[in-house]
């Protein structure tokens, strides 16, 4: 599957040919996770509305929830002003983080408003 050349021309990829992909929950606005996409992963996501990412460690594609059941149905995909990050607006089924939490930012708070 190939990415529309008009979209591909707007992407600013890193040295590995990837762009950052941030998933945000449509219902709550929660920022759920960040992963990586190459042109193929983005093309698959746009074609299927299933969030598809590229694993740098496994060097393969993965569809969110394919094994866990914690799927992301993609309602909208936006490209940021620099062209180096895409935002996926999704319906999240189950946990978004591989640790089992709702978001990947449910852990350590480095700075918060004073109590």
From Swiss-Prot:
Complexes and interactors: Homodimer.
Listed InterPro entries: PRA-CH, PRib_AMP_CycHydrolase_dom, PRib_AMP_CycHydrolase_sf
Residue positions binding Zn(2+): 81, 97, 104
PANTHER family reported for this sequence: HISTIDINE BIOSYNTHESIS BIFUNCTIONAL PROTEIN, PHOSPHORIBOSYL-AMP CYCLOHYDROLASE
Gene that this sequence comes from: hisI
A Pfam cross-reference name: PRA-CH
Organism lineage string: Bacteria, Bacillati, Actinomycetota, Actinomycetes, Mycobacteriales
BP GO terms, sorted: L-histidine biosynthetic process
Pathway: Amino-acid biosynthesis; L-histidine biosynthesis; L-histidine from 5-phospho-alpha-D-ribose 1-diphosphate: step 3/9
Enzyme class of the recorded protein, top EC level: hydrolase
Subcellular location: Cytoplasm
Note on cofactor: Binds 1 Mg(2+) ion per subunit.
Protein name: Phosphoribosyl-AMP cyclohydrolase
Needed co-factor(s): Mg(2+); Zn(2+)
Family classification: Belongs to the PRA-CH family.
Reaction catalysed by this enzyme: 1-(5-phospho-beta-D-ribosyl)-5'-AMP + H2O = 1-(5-phospho-beta-D-ribosyl)-5-[(5-phospho-beta-D-ribosylamino)methylideneamino]imidazole-4-carboxamide
Keyword Zinc in record: yes
HAMAP family xrefs: HisI
Coiled coil region boundaries: none
């Amino acid at each position: 599957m190939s990415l529309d050349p008009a979209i591909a021309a707007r992407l600013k990829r890193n040295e590995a040919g990837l762009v950052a992909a941030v998933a945000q929950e449509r219902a709550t606005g929660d920022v759920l996770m960040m992963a990586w996409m190459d042109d193929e992963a983005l093309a698959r996501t746009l074609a299927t509305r299933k969030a598809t990412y590229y694993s740098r460690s496994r060097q393969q594609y993965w569809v969110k929830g394919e094994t866990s059941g914690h799927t992301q149905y993609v309602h909208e995909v936006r490209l940021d002003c620099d062209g180096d990050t895409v935002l996926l607006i999704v319906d999240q089924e189950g946990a978004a983080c591989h640790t089992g939490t709702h978001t990947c930012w449910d852990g350590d708070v480095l700075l918060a408003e004073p109590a």
